[in-house]
């Protein structure tokens, strides 16, 4: 199946590839290469995650955001950058995709990869590596177990996609394996309230994601819009059972601009919208030197080199307010909107 139109978000069927049919790998990688160079967004179908597990996870996210504000604020994000992020906490400034001057109309709960207390990153106090803040079991008895089950499945899917990305970049299929041994993935478990938006205010304002790739199960509640390279905003359709995948800023740096980080936004919905976005990223100390297939005398390196951790800290500190795990200047927030 040829995918050669940039006026809609394409659908990539990865079922045969995930089942081990190597004969499909070259064709699927070729499709992925075109998508990542021209659009940066796509749907995957036959991805292996059950609809039942995804629904259970979304119901837990709904339950968490339905807690009284006093309970949510006890779990508020701090210097460890995990936990509850109130509404009116982000204005995205790390992109020129929009003239963002209003705080976003969403509240979210940030969870990172679960690590033991003696993990070197925990011991070092490294941001975005934990420990997580879990709601008390007497309030949400199944939250932790359900979300860990869901995140484990999402991590497995992210790992399964690595050989496909390697092939798409003309690298050995196992190229990324040693760079994702302890991935710095994080999640945003978001509630977009059905609240009136001000002028130039969004559920989430125009931005590009921070990392390698983002995995997001589709929502029946519309709102996602993706900016094409011609500057038009196209609406993300609902594709039954699909997952949205897009690349972020670190991918763009790592590929020396070859695989693009595409601006997108979410309009304030007319009904409550709940999602769980999974940001699949490499080990914290992976550096953004251009990948071997993405740099040459004709295509010299064009971005400053950082570790992934440095890149992530810069992204969050510039886009998130000081009371929400970042360093951006504060604007009066209204935690009553939930």
Residue ranges and their predicted role:
Residues 1-338:
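Peripheral, non-catalytic segments flanking oxidoreductase cores
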């Amino acid at each position: 199946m040829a995918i050669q139109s940039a006026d809609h978000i394409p659908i990539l069927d990865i079922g045969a590839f995930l089942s081990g049919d190597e004969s499909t790998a070259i064709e699927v990688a070729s499709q992925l290469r075109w998508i990542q160079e021209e659009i940066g967004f796509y749907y995957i179908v036959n991805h292996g995650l059950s609809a039942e597990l995804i629904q259970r996870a979304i119901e837990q996210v709904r339950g968490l955001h339905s807690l009284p504000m006093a309970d949510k604020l006890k779990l508020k994000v701090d210097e460890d950058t995990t936990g509850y992020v109130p509404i009116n906490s982000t204005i995205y400034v790390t992109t020129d995709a929009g003239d963002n001057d209003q705080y976003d109309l969403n509240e979210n709960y940030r969870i990172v990869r679960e690590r033991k207390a003696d993990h070197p990153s925990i011991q070092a106090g490294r941001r975005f590596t934990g420990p997580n803040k879990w709601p008390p079991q007497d309030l949400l008895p199944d939250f932790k177990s359900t979300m860990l089950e869901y995140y484990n499945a999402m991590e497995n899917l992210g790992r399964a996609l690595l050989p496909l990305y390697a092939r798409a970049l003309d690298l050995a299929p196992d190229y990324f394996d040693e760079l994702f041994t302890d991935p710095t993935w994080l999640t945003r478990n978001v509630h977009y309230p059905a609240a009136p938006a001000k002028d130039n205010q969004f559920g989430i304002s125009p931005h590009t994601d921070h990392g390698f790739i983002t995995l997001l199960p589709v929502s029946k509640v519309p709102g996602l819009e993706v900016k094409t390279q011609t500057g038009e905003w196209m609406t993300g359709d609902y594709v039954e059972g699909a997952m949205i995948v897009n690349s972020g800023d670190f991918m763009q740096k790592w590929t020396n601009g070859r695989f693009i980080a595409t601006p997108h936004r979410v309009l304030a919905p007319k009904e409550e919208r709940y999602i769980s976005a999974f940001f699949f990223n490499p080990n914290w100390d992976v550096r953004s030197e251009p990948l071997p297939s993405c740099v040459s005398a004709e295509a010299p390196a064009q971005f400053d080199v950082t570790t992934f951790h440095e890149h992530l800290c810069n992204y969050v500190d510039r886009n998130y307010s000081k009371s929400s795990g970042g360093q951006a200047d504060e604007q009066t927030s209204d935690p009553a909107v939930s």
